[in-house]
């Protein structure tokens, strides 16, 4: 493969530096709206759908897309876009199942849902798996950023008389420092508004690059004729080559990846949790899927198509042997003049940073919610005033962001030897998403799914997955659909099918044998030393899992060990656990949504349609989160005392930045005026003299 260095001019570097300084100042400015951990992680649950939709574009498109889809577009043509528009068939499950549940249950992280739905033990294992997933995702992001900027860097750099080789890892370290600065001090509000800006810029830059490329070639007709027929096909070949095939990509990206991105990507989930309501989140998701992703498919893939056309027309300009991961940079440098190339590269790196900063913020949220707080409770430290605790947690969140950034840099080492970012990302998704994907999906949509089933999915399913990774030619081969195994990177994509089947099969098997487990536990409790037996089984399972993990023994022995884990884990979970199906499913599954809404409000839901009213505001004494409107205004809104409302600055272009959620209190007699407390005014960032709109939520 032909690789490049020193692409670009000093003008391009000046443009990029100015761009990044502007972005960091922009993010730091909105960091002033971060007053507590709710703002740091969730943006205060205040934003409008259009702002979140555009912010999601920056995160989704920036999710390594420019580099990896341009690479596959250069190698395979229009079929590179097939993975970019395959989320739609899981969207209804997200819109009407998972999204309302995570909002109405008021969970702050995905593992917290596992505790409410199953048990604290399930939360513990979910935290481990999700942290691995998120840190791995950050590593992929840093890898992509490094590969994007490396072609622009010289091979060596001399500082203070000492020469340094510019390597991938050194580039990644510098990028990580820049990326971590404003996310550490800004939080989710800074990320959302920075991504809003970058979302517009990267869509424009990607489409502008396509226009420049077509103009460079001549016109669209010439471009179309230059592309080989195979490059014009919408789908890849069914089962070849091993590096890019339809069936492997379907299971890796279309199933495991799509559910993983929608259901377990904490960064994406936090964007939706920052919307002001479930309906606003649904609008954002629908617009993203129906309109933004098809446009984005062109934005992220066109550099590869242009590169292939130029390579066919004049191989001396773009060599057919150009490294696929560098094709975006190479094409942009050819078709764009100095300065414009710098702007396009700034958009690329900004898009990638959008993903990384979101993931760092999300992983810090998991750490605070599922490691820091439970650890404090476990150590039984004396609880202090909430405001003091919140300040400490905000400081801990910022320290966690720094530590997670450093860990993400280390994670790059696990992926840097793959031929392309696309294959590294595919392997990552196939390996780390299946256990959590299966657990979330079955937990949300199947009331019968038990703690024993989810724990066995996590432990037994992962044991079987590790065996598949160790012995792919034996265990994954029966599911490979005729794909030839690459011995260097065996079954990067189709392993997702094997892993999903193992986890799904274990979860379903244990759920259907729940009564058998209860019978075994009943018999076990008949022994005098039943507790010792229970602890002995736990010790045996730990030993067997470690043996599978370190590959101690033959395949037949390890497979027997994994099966024994699957059979014994549900017994000990049932023995030691206390599970009430009604308590642990009501309001926590898709079938009990009305109960979830009532719990969210704290009383019966009022769905009567009322008006949205415009109000002036006054500071008044009050309690808690209560605001007071006039009796006439409440009648117009068809609201009662105790209902929930959303107060927002009238200026719609702010997207909900200046807003609060509150509760209707007893009415007063001053029409057109709402009484709020000083703390509510600070939280809503309301400006003196500015009119507010009040909307009843439920």
Please annotate each region the language model reported:
Residues 606-648, 659-696:
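Short beta-strand-centered segments at strand-helix junctions
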């Amino acid at each position: 493969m032909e690789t490049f260095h020193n692409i670009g001019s000093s003008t391009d570097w000046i443009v990029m530096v100015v761009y990044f300084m502007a972005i960091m100042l922009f993010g730091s400015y909105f960091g002033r709206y971060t007053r507590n951990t709710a703002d740091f992680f969730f943006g205060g649950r205040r934003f409008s759908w259009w702002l979140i939709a555009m912010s999601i574009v920056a995160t989704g498109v920036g999710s390594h897309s420019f580099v990896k889809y341009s690479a596959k577009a250069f190698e395979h043509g229009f079929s590179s876009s097939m993975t970019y528009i395959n989320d739609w068939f899981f969207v209804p499950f997200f819109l009407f199942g998972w999204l309302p549940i995570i909002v109405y249950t008021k969970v702050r992280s995905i593992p917290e849902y596992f505790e409410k739905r199953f048990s604290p033990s399930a939360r513990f294992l979910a935290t481990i798996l999700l942290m691995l997933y998120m840190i791995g995702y950050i590593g992929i992001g840093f890898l992509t950023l490094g590969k994007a900027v490396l072609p622009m860097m010289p091979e060596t750099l001399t500082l203070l008389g000492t020469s340094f080789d510019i390597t991938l890892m050194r580039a990644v370290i510098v990028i990580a420092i820049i990326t971590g600065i404003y996310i550490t001090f800004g939080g989710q509000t800074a990320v959302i508004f920075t991504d809003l800006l970058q979302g517009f810029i990267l869509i424009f830059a990607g489409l502008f690059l396509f226009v420049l490329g077509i103009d460079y070639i001549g016109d669209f007709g010439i471009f179309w004729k230059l592309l080989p027929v195979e490059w014009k096909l919408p789908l890849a070949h069914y089962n070849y080559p091993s590096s890019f095939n339809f069936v492997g990509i379907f299971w890796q990206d279309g199933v495991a990846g799509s559910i993983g991105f929608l259901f377990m990507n904490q960064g994406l989930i936090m964007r939706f949790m920052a919307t002001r309501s479930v309906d606003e989140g649904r609008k954002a998701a629908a617009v993203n899927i129906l309109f933004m992703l098809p446009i984005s498919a062109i934005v992220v893939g066109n550099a590869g198509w242009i590169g292939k056309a130029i390579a066919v027309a004049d191989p001396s300009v773009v060599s057919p042997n150009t490294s696929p991961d560098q094709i975006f940079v190479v094409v942009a440098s050819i078709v764009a003049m100095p300065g414009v190339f710098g702007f396009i590269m700034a958009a690329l790196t900004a898009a990638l940073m959008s993903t990384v900063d979101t993931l760092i913020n999300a992983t810090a949220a998991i750490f605070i919610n599922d490691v820091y707080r439970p650890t404090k409770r476990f150590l039984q430290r004396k609880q202090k005033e909430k405001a003091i605790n919140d300040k400490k947690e905000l400081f801990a969140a910022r320290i966690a962001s720094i530590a997670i950034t450093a860990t993400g840099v280390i994670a790059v080492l696990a992926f840097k030897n793959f031929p392309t970012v696309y294959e590294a990302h595919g392997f990552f998704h196939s390996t780390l998403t299946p256990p959590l994907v299966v657990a979330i999906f079955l937990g949300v949509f199947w009331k019968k799914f038990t703690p024993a089933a989810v724990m066995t999915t996590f432990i037994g399913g992962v044991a079987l997955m590790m065996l598949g990774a160790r012995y792919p030619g034996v265990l994954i081969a029966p599911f490979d659909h005729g794909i030839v195994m690459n011995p260097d990177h065996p079954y990067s994509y189709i392993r997702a099918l094997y892993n999903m089947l193992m986890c799904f099969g274990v979860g379903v098997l244990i759920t259907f044998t729940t009564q058998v487990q209860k019978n075994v536990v009943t018999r076990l409790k008949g022994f005098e030393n039943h507790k010792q037996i229970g602890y002995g089984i736990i010790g045996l399972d730990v030993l067997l899992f470690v043996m599978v993990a370190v590959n101690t023994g033959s395949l037949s022995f390890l497979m027997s060990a994994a099966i024994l884990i699957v059979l014994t884990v549900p017994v000990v979970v049932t023995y030691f656990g206390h599970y009430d199906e009604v308590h642990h499913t009501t309001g926590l599954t898709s079938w009990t949504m009305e109960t979830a809404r009532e719990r969210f409000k704290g009383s019966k839901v009022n769905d009567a349609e009322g008006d949205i009213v415009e109000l002036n505001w006054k500071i008044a004494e009050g309690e808690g989160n209560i605001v007071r409107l006039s009796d006439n205004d409440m009648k117009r809104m068809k609201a009662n005392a105790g209902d929930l409302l959303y107060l927002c600055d009238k200026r719609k272009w702010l997207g909900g930045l200046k807003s609060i959620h509150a509760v209707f209190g007893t009415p007063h007699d001053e029409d057109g005026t709402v009484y709020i407390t000083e703390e509510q005014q600070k939280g809503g960032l309301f400006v003196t003299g500015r009119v507010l709109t009040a909307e009843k939520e439920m």
